[in-house]
Design a protein with these regions (language model features):
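Helical element adjacent to the flavin cofactor pocket in flavoenzyme catalytic cores
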Residues: 87-144, 153
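Conserved flavin/dinucleotide-binding core of flavoenzymes
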Residues: 214-332
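Short, surface-exposed acidic
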Residues: 54-64, 176-179, 259-267
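Amphipathic alpha-helical segments that form well-ordered structural scaffolds
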Residues: 49, 111, 115-119, 249-253
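Generic structural signal for well-ordered, non-membrane alpha-helical segments
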Residues: 39, 43, 60-61, 105, ...
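Mid-domain catalytic core of redox enzymes
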Residues: 131-244, 248, 252-257, 286
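Mobile amphipathic helical/loop "lid" adjacent to a hydrophobic cofactor/ligand pocket
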Residues: 1-86
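Surface-exposed helix-capping loop/turn segments at secondary-structure junctions
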Residues: 39, 57, 122-127, 139, ...
Length: 332
């Protein structure tokens, strides 16, 4: 209940199983990172900055690496320090609520997508789900043709590897090249169902040296108490495993905490191979003026100038594209 930033200071100083000297070192590194964030220094990889600071290996393994993997879904060697600063500055460093960790008890479709669709329908929007869209074309009057229908403008809010195939055929090479050069990282989620309840230490339990980085106690979210979900960010960097291998490794992680468990009764493994774009130093979206002149407005989490590919980035990018479209039509 302490005001910011005392809540962070107190939380770190009260952390268990960490020496006082490491706590002070972490606070010192955080202060140095805040100083970097306020300046206009060149961007660099997080790993490079950590080496420059001679950060102890334990802090790298138990704090910085989980933080960067979870926030940027990019390995330390390639992760942008500037983007990490933006996430911290607008989040945990900004105010006390910014450090509150929220776990939804419903799926994100029910929380975000379905209410958004319902709101659009209130305004008379024509929602067409499961409809394949072909390459966009412009009519002489400037309108955009989508599947033989003409529209005043189009916001392309698809994954980047789909968007590049939707842009007009004469789209400049620099835009197409930017899209083709994007790098991606995977996220793997492993679901395990046991014969008995699995009571983890917290709704979200972190593992610094396991295969899984986070174990989610589904019972705390109103779901069956005998189910555990494990999240592995940058899973392409962790290893190339088959589904059964992922399940076995995560089961071993769970048994470290709850050794009484037998083999799971059921498992499910989902790997999104292109879950997010890599968040690398000095990366920035291309100039979309050519597309804007043709009433085509790209949007997506991968286009945010300050954030990694996150829900926040997706929402803000969509708002920016919509505002630019309305502005070009003189509506705002």
């Amino acid at each position: 209940n302490l005001p910011s930033p005392l809540h962070i200071l107190t939380g770190i100083l009260r952390a268990k199983n960490v020496s006082f000297s490491l706590k002070i070192r972490l606070l010192s590194d955080m202060a140095a990172l805040q100083h970097y964030a306020r300046g206009k220094r060149a961007d660099l990889a997080v790993a490079q900055w950590l080496r420059q600071r001679n950060v102890p290996r334990r802090l790298v393994a138990e704090f910085w690496q989980p933080l960067v993997w979870g926030a940027l879904n990019t390995p330390l060697e390639h992760a942008s320090l500037r983007i990490l600063c933006n996430v911290l500055s607008d989040g945990v460093w900004a105010d006390k609520p910014g450090s509150d960790y929220l776990l939804p008890k419903r799926d994100l479709g029910a929380i975000i997508a379905e209410p958004a669709l319902a709101k659009l329908k209130q305004f008379g929007a024509d929602i067409r789900l499961e409809t394949r869209v072909g390459r966009l074309k412009n009519l002489p009057d400037g309108r955009v043709v989508v599947n033989d229908e003409a529209f005043d403008a189009v916001i392309v809010a698809t994954a980047p590897y789909h968007a590049v195939h939707l842009f007009p055929e004469d789209t400049p090479d620099y835009i197409q090249t930017t899209y083709q050069n994007l790098q991606y990282h995977s996220i793997t989620t492993v679901y395990l169902r046991y014969a008995v309840p699995v009571h983890l230490p917290a709704p979200l339990t972190g593992l610094a040296d396991g295969t899984a980085q986070w174990l989610v106690y589904r019972g705390a979210l109103g779901l069956p108490t005998n189910e555990v979900a494990a999240v592995i960010s940058v899973s392409d960097y962790v290893g190339a495993f088959k589904s059964q291998e992922w399940a076995e490794k995560v089961h071993a992680d769970v048994k470290r905490i709850r050794p009484y468990l037998d083999e799971p009764e059921a498992v499910r493994v989902i790997t999104e191979k292109r879950a997010t774009t890599a968040c690398m130093p000095d990366s920035s979206p291309p100039d979309f003026a050519w597309l804007h002149q043709r009433r085509i407005y790209p949007a997506g989490d991968y286009l945010h100038p300050r954030y990694p590919a996150t829900l926040e980035a997706a929402v803000q990018s969509g708002l920016t594209a919509a505002e630019r479209c309305l502005s070009d039509f003189g509506l705002i």
